[in-house]
């Protein structure tokens, strides 16, 4: 109710400025004890990747890139939080403006470009937060690292976040880092997954704790590509797959203001494509590993549809922009029914 009153003011601001203001406001409200005053929704606990989740509704990566807002976000009732994408070295991302709303379609286009303050800063924030819930950390490569050396960046991040994450997501599907999606192709993906699984095994022995690895993929894949990725995930023993990232397609928003901005489209317009990928993955994986469904969840029924398509967990991001924090409770309650 409250969000519906303040949303017009937020939408009158530049999208990225509104994003920052909202997170700052959430932090202040949490410190004042104003977040989470309502009783939390009674969620249905689930076990996925060997991890116990208090409920199946998580925050998708991208909202809190540096892990600087964990306490405020945790108070909203999520079953888990995923922060990042983080890279080995700080980088500013793409020039502004780089975040655009499409209110008529309940969509968002972003070309942020993995802007973040670097993995060392993220780790410091996580430690300082004292957050004890289920935390996923999403890792990527720096813009100026060629694809031939991409594994070096992912391994550098994995080394540093391993001790602080309950699971780690390898992001090879953002459309906003040039040529990144080429890492989804057979030979490149095979080599990357081999390197990551080897390092995961070494780190598990070093830390005495196994931290699952998830791979985040794009919605802009045909069935043959999805089948090939599924086969590689199973062959390498990857622990989960996140479907999906944003889309470069514009069919669902053609003719709308901002529709021609470059970048990845999220929100309601990606819902069907994302669910299609979840369903196709489920068919090819046959339960071999869990799917985390993300893309276009703006209601409890949308969350339920992702689960029905084959997902074990869901994540929210753009839906929070359009529906507010009450969406978390709605989804948690719907999935508990």
Curated annotation (Swiss-Prot):
It holds the Pfam family DHO_dh. The keyword Oxidoreductase applies. It is found in: Cell membrane. Transmembrane segments: none annotated. GO terms for cellular component: cytoplasm; plasma membrane. Binds 1 FMN per subunit. Substrate binds at residues 65, 110-114, 171, 176, 245-246. The active site is at residue 174. Catalyzes the conversion of dihydroorotate to orotate with quinone as electron acceptor. Belongs to the dihydroorotate dehydrogenase family. Type 2 subfamily. This is Dihydroorotate dehydrogenase (quinone). It comes from Thiobacillus denitrificans (strain ATCC 25259 / T1).
């Amino acid at each position: 109710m409250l969000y519906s009153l303040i949303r017009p003011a937020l939408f009158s601001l530049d999208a990225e400025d509104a994003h920052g203001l909202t997170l700052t406001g959430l932090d202040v409200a949490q410190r004042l004890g104003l977040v989470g005053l309502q009783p939390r929704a009674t969620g249905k606990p689930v076990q996925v990747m060997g991890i116990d989740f208090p409920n199946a509704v998580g925050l998708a990566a991208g909202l809190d890139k540096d892990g600087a807002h964990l306490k405020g976000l945790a108070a909203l009732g999520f079953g888990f939080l995923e922060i990042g994408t983080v890279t080995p070295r700080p980088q500013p991302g793409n020039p502004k403006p780089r975040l655009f709303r499409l209110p008529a379609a309940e969509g968002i286009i972003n070309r942020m470009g993995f802007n973040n303050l670097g993995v060392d800063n993220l780790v410091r924030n996580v430690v300082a937060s004292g957050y004890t819930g289920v935390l996923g950390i999403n890792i990527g490569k720096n813009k100026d690292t060629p694809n031939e050396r991409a594994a070096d960046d992912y391994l550098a991040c994995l080394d540093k976040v391993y001790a602080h994450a309950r699971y780690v997501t390898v992001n090879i599907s953002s459309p906003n880092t040039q040529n990144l999606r080429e890492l989804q192709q057979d030979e490149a993906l095979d080599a990357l997954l081999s390197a990551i699984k080897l390092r995961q095994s070494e780190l598990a022995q070093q830390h005495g704790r196994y931290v699952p690895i998830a791979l985040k993929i794009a919605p802009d894949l045909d069935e043959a590509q999805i089948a090939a990725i599924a086969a590689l995930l199973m062959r390498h023993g990857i622990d989960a797959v996140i479907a999906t990232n944003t889309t470069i397609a514009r069919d669902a928003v053609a003719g709308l203001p901002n529709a021609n901005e470059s970048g990845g489209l999220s929100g309601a317009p990606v819902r069907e494509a994302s669910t299609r990928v979840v369903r196709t993955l489920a068919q090819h994986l046959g339960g071999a590993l869990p799917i985390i469904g993300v893309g276009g969840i703006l209601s409890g029924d949308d969350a339920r549809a992702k689960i029905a398509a084959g997902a074990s967990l869901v994540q929210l991001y753009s839906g929070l922009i359009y529906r507010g924090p009450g969406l978390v409770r709605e989804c948690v309650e719907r999935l508990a029914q």
